[in-house]
């Protein structure tokens, strides 16, 4: 029988199977022998050992479309990164670090600013929101008032989406809104997963509707860019790409060079000043890291 790994704790893998049940499984020894580690999000073949106890064995991992390093998850279609408009105030540099990590791994990202009822939309628009200026689709939501929920549901439908963001921004509220009726049907998932002590520190997959899955990840308060040279950084700011052909120098870093298409676009308000300032800060951070 086929299914998806929705959680892995202490050598046990919890599989959401085709029959709608969740099976607690051990992986066969061949995976250890081959030094292969199943990941949350993997599609798997299982053999059922005890139907009543819902226990089984993972016999095969089906080919992965992709896999992320942070968070460690397989077969992801997109990332949905949530920050609050207020309480806590958005940390834009932290947001940009996350977006760069997704760009590095080739995963499209959508930005959600939650708690719309608390924030000043005009201020956020000035800083960040206009999509051509930040290079990403942006959604405003309020779980309190039900705003933006239908739009989010459309964005997530039919995909496996990593949901990420700092603690306290309303990630779990949005996830609960998305689950709707399926919360009743997958109550067994909740019961099974409560067996582990470490549930909040691990990523888990939540089935939302047919072919729609959310990968709930632990909240983050800091992220560090690794395995990157400072001259690569510009490749991970998608809004720069449109203006780079206007740069006089090939390999322009968009910092001190004359006749820079990106800096001209910035001066004309076509690129977010906030994003550009974060680019400069991260460029210096990577340069310092290389020095040591």
Language model regions located:
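Short, structured beta-strand/loop micro-motifs enriched in basic residues and often containing a Trp
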Residues: 21-30
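SH3/SH3-like beta-barrel fold
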Residues: 13-17, 25, 46
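Phosphate-binding glycine-rich loops and their immediate beta-loop-alpha structural context
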Residues: 86-134
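Helix-rich effector regions associated with P-loop NTPase G domains
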Residues: 11, 29, 35-52, 62-78, ...
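Canonical P-loop GTPase G-domain recognition
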Residues: 117-169
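Short, Lys/Arg- and Gly-enriched loop/turn segments at beta-strand edges
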Residues: 51-61, 89-91
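Structural detector for short beta-strands of small beta-barrel domains
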Residues: 1-9
């Amino acid at each position: 029988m086929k299914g998806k790994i929705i959680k892995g704790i202490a050598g046990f893998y919890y599989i959401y199977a085709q029959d709608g049940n969740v099976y607690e499984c051990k992986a066969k020894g061949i995976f250890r022998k081959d030094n292969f580690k199943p990941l949350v999000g993997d599609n798997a073949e299982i053999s059922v050992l005890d139907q009543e106890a819902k226990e089984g064995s993972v016999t095969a991992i089906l080919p992965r479309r992709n896999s992320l390093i942070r968070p460690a998850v397989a077969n992801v279609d997109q990332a949905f990164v949530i920050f609050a408009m207020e309480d806590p105030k958005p940390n834009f540099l932290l947001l940009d670090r996350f977006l760069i990590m997704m760009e590095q791994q080739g995963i499209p990202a959508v930005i959600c600013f939650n708690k719309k009822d608390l924030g000043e939309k005009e201020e956020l628009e000035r800083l960040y929101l206009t999509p051509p200026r930040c290079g990403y689709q942006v959604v405003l939501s309020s779980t309190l008032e039900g705003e933006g929920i239908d739009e989010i549901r459309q964005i997530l439908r039919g995909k496996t989406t990593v949901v990420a963001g700092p603690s306290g921004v309303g990630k779990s509220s949005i996830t609960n809104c998305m689950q709707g009726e399926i919360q009743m049907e997958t109550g067994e998932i909740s019961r099974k997963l409560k067996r582990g002590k470490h549930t909040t520190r691990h990523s888990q997959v939540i089935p939302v509707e047919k072919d729609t899955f959310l990968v709930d990840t632990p909240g983050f308060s800091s992220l560090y860019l690794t395995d990157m040279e400072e001259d690569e950084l510009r490749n991970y700011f998608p809004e720069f790409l449109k203006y780079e052909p206007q740069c006089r120098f090939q390999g322009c870093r968009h910092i001190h060079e004359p006749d820079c298409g990106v800096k001209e676009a910035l001066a004309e308000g076509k690129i977010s000043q906030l994003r550009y300032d974060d680019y400069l800060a991260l460029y210096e951070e990577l340069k310092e890291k290389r020095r040591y």
